[in-house]
């Protein structure tokens, strides 16, 4: 079995694959102070509850945007799974992905590994020009060409960051739950107005950025396909006109694909 670990700023998502099939996945809050032993206890418990024998894990792929947790995860995996692994933990990086994705940016090593993983995963299944939107702690727009060249993207504050800023940087605005979708754009009370502002506002922002990228990326000659992923993708998609597909498991599936693709190139 293959364990993939996607360590994000807010959440860590793990998935377990058996012969190409996702048999379990878990989403937990990222705690930057966790030790390798604490991580092992936490996830060993999840495996046991699902009836999964962790000794059957033969490969582990790690993609982390939290450097302090990368080393803890590697120590955890090496200590608690190492004797059963076919190879050391595959810790993904720009350099590691170089055989699969060409990065044409000013500073390639600044690009978050999750963005390149998503770019490759989306490209692998479609083989066309793509805009990949990830609704995470930050919202990222990533542009990849039909020959799998990553040419850059856009980063803006995520929905949770904006909600937190409204509640903490103002005297009277409350923290609101945007999963309660407003029935109209014009708010009749403060909570309604804030919900509308976030949902309709982010929807319009997504559409505006996508249209701008379409013009700049391909010069209007053809349109890139637009794919969304991340925890808030389903929430924002109804307020946009440009998102064509949602793939909630894009990152996990891409990491499993990358393991096999890199093994073939060894």
Curated annotation (Swiss-Prot):
Entry's EC annotation? 2.7.1.33
Sorted alphabetically, the Gene Ontology BP terms of this entry are: coenzyme A biosynthetic process
From what organism does this protein derive? Answer: Desulfotalea psychrophila (strain LSv54 / DSM 12343)
Which residues are listed for ATP binding in this entry? 6-13, 137
Q: Which gene encodes it?
A: coaX
- Spell out the NCBIfam families in the cross-references: baf, PRK13321.1
Enumerate the cofactors the protein uses.
NH4(+); K(+)
Stated name of the protein: Type III pantothenate kinase
Coiled coil start-end: none
CC cofactor note: A monovalent cation. Ammonium or potassium.
């Amino acid at each position: 079995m293959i364990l993939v670990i996607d360590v994000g700023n807010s959440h860590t998502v793990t998935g377990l694959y058996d012969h190409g099939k996702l048999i379990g996945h878990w989403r937990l809050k990222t705690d930057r102070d966790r030790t390798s032993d604490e991580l092992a206890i936490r996830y060993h418990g999840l495996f046991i509850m699902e009836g999964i024998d962790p000794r059957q894990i033969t490969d582990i792929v790690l993609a982390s945007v939290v450097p302090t947790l990368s080393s803890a995860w590697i120590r955890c995996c090496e200590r608690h799974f190492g004797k059963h692994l076919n190879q050391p933990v595959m810790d993904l990086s720009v350099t590691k992905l170089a055989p699969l994705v060409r990065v044409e940016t000013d500073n390639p090593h600044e690009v978050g590994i999750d963005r390149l993983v998503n770019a490759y995963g989306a490209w692998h299944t479609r083989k066309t020009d793509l805009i990949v939107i990830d609704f995470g702690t930050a919202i990222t727009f990533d542009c990849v060409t039909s020959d799998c060249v990553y040419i850059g993207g856009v980063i803006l504050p995520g929905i949770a960051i904006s909600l937190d800023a409204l509640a903490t940087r103002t005297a009277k605005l409350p923290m609101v739950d945007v999963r309660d979708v407003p029935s109209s754009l014009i708010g009749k009370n403060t909570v309604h107005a804030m919900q509308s502002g976030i949902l309709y506002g982010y929807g319009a922002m997504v559409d505006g950025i996508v249209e701008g990228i379409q013009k700049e990326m391909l010069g209007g000659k053809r349109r890139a396909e637009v794919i969304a992923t991340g925890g808030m993708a389903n929430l924002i998609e109804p307020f946009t006109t440009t998102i064509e597909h949602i793939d909630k498991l894009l990152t996990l599936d891409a990491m499993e694909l990358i393991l096999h693709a890199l093994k073939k190139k060894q």
